[in-house]
Amino acid sequence: MSEIKKVVRTLTGRVVSDKMNKTVTVLVERRVKHPVIGKVIRMSKKYHAHDENNECHEGDTVQIEESRKLSRTKAWTVSKLVERARV
């Protein structure tokens, strides 16, 4: 039989809060063309992501991937730390 590979959704964003235990808030920005005006605008959304070792801090750029529901608001996990925040 053929193996079925599951496609995992990944997003890249900036950590805006690390005050919770094993959880970070990640701000993901995307650029969208306005349907009427035609201007390119920035839209953003915040995701709560699971950070098992509490290694991400505010300002870091991280890659998150979709996972099973871990709590009421948390369904993403931090898969990779892309860049540390410049202090």
Curated annotation (Swiss-Prot):
* GO cellular component labels: cytosolic small ribosomal subunit
- TM helices/strands, residue ranges: none
What the entry lists under InterPro entries is as follows: NA-bd_OB-fold, Ribosomal_uS17, Ribosomal_uS17_bact/chlr
GO BP term (any one): translation
SUPFAM superfamilies, alphabetically?
Nucleic acid-binding proteins
Q: Does the keyword Ubl conjugation apply?
A: no
Q: Which UniProt keywords apply?
A: Ribonucleoprotein, Ribosomal protein, RNA-binding, rRNA-binding
The terms under GO molecular function for this entry are: rRNA binding; structural constituent of ribosome
What this protein is reported to do is described as:
One of the primary rRNA binding proteins, it binds specifically to the 5'-end of 16S ribosomal RNA.
Which family is it part of?
Belongs to the universal ribosomal protein uS17 family.
Q: How does it assemble?
A: Part of the 30S ribosomal subunit.
The protein here is known as: Small ribosomal subunit protein uS17
- UniProt source species: Thiobacillus denitrificans (strain ATCC 25259 / T1)
